[in-house]
Regions:
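Charge-dense, helix-prone N-terminal extensions
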Residues: 1-107
């Protein structure tokens, strides 16, 4: 029986930079993915962060351990950004595509 591979930030980034107009960049000192000048996903201490809205935002926050992204650590979270821990890595590719749509729609 073949072992199912768990997505990593690198595998998600590889897929989106190969198939979408996404590029690797940096945001707050962390590796991130951007479309144009807009960041939509990033690698944060072994978790991934995603810029999400609406139902996708609610679904992400419903995952155990997920929370709003607070890069300053001063209780000032970025309201559209959700940290999804590695235990939910199987969902990362889906949330990355939804986050990409968020910045595409904003154009």
């Amino acid at each position: 029986m073949a072992k199912k591979l768990i997505p990593t930030y690198e595998s998600v980034a590889d897929e989106l930079t190969a198939t979408a107009e996404a590029v690797r960049s940096q945001m707050f000192g962390m590796p991130c993915l951007k479309r144009g000048s807009k960041a939509f996903a990033g690698d944060y201490h072994g978790a991934m962060v995603f810029k999400l809205r609406g139902e996708a935002h609610a679904q992400a926050l419903a995952l155990r351990g997920a929370h709003l992204f607070d890069p300053s650590g001063r209780d000032r979270p970025m309201k559209e950004w959700v940290v999804i821990p590695a235990e939910h890595a199987a969902h990362w590719p889906e949330f990355a595509r939804l986050a990409l749509e968020t910045v595409v729609e904003a154009r």
